[in-house]
Regions:
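A conserved ligand/cofactor-binding region detector
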Residues: 1-335
Length: 335
């Protein structure tokens, strides 16, 4: 950096010096604090701590979910929170219902608007009015009909574009997101393997017919993520070629996943998996898109899942696993 951008580096050093001098006046005896908050990483190859530079140069630091904001304050940037507590705010990520409901699922939008009007398009809280129709058999049937239609549309699209056949009568269990170890697609795959073995060992049990749909891409150099994709396809190959699994269990890794594909998959989903290790997902917005389209969330208490659970009620979301604090305690105990 010094060779390519010498003046930029000089300015960064100047800002760092001024910042450290101001902190030194507040905490004259805490030299370790100065070392921790310096923009310069002092090791064999000096590096610029860009997040620190950003914090000092910003009037506001936003977390993107309540848990994420709390982690920023107590762990990631706790020294800076001590210096600038007024700068740290929470701004939970969000999505636009114009795209992720009205545009991708016009059929569901139509039956919602028929009941409560179209004010929900710009004031999403108006969807709470639907609670009055939760036990209405006619509305329930309309909702089920839309879900079935979107599943048929996805099945037809997959058949036409990838030659893959899936049964719209089965439960669509979906995990679509960037492939990463912390997002735990591997955990989902292990569950598929477990379910497959259980079906083989106990064919008499009344298992619900289920289609597992995976989608996502790995970073070019992320070897482990590519192994996870490989494993998912290998498991799909075994399960889908087993005659005993006919009409009972199917596994599909949807090729060439992108936003356009997501627009087809999300309205068709029955169960949506958001199972990151607690404390690792900043927020996530896929969970919001799925629940807006009537899917049930299976997830950990991480990111925006926590706030979704508070909003919809614990009885309307499937959660499991450790909390962020429990994960942290386990890590500190030498796990």
């Amino acid at each position: 950096m010094g060779r390519l951008l010498p003046r930029h580096l000089e300015i960064i050093y100047q800002i760092n010096d001024l910042f450290l001098e101001s902190v030194k006046k507040q905490f004259p005896d805490d030299t370790d604090l100065l070392r921790r908050i310096s923009f310069i990483e002092e090791n064999d190859h000096k590096q610029i701590r860009m997040p620190y530079l950003s914090i000092v140069g910003s009037h506001t630091i936003n977390g993107v979910a309540e848990l994420h904001t709390e982690l920023l304050k107590t762990t990631v940037f706790k020294d800076f929170y001590k210096l600038f507590p007024e700068r740290f705010q929470n701004k939970t990520n969000g999505i636009t219902p114009r795209l992720w409901l009205r545009n991708v699922n016009p059929e569901l939008s139509k039956i919602i608007t028929a009941k409560i009007g179209d004010g929900w398009i710009t004031e999403l809280q108006q969807l709470r009015q639907l609670e009055a129709f939760a036990d209405d058999p006619e509305f329930q049937q309309s909702w089920r009909s839309v879900k079935r239609l979107k599943k048929e549309q996805l099945a037809n699209w997959l058949k036409q574009n990838s030659g893959i056949s899936i049964d719209p009568e089965s439960l669509f269990d979906v995990q679509i997101k960037r492939i990463h170890e912390y997002k735990r697609q591997l955990l989902n795959i292990l569950h598929v393997i477990y379910l497959y073995n259980q079906m083989l060992e106990h064919p008499e049990l009344p298992f619900v017919s289920r289609t597992f749909l995976f989608g996502g891409k790995a970073a070019p150099g992320y070897f482990m993520a590519k192994l996870i994709i490989n494993l998912a396809n290998d498991v799909a190959r075994v399960v889908n070629h087993d005659p005993a699994m006919q009409d009972r269990l199917k596994v599909v890794f949807v090729p060439n996943y992108n936003v356009s594909v997501a627009e087809k998959m999300i309205p068709a989903t029955d169960i949506s998996q958001h199972i990151s290790t607690a404390g690792t997902e900043a927020s996530g917005t896929g969970n919001m898109k799925f629940i807006l389209n009537g899917a049930l969330i299976l997830g950990t208490m991480d990111g925006a899942n926590i706030e979704i659970a508070e909003e919809v009620g614990a009885e309307n979301i499937f959660t499991f696993g450790m909390s962020s604090d429990e994960v942290s305690s386990l890590a500190k105990s030498g796990y």
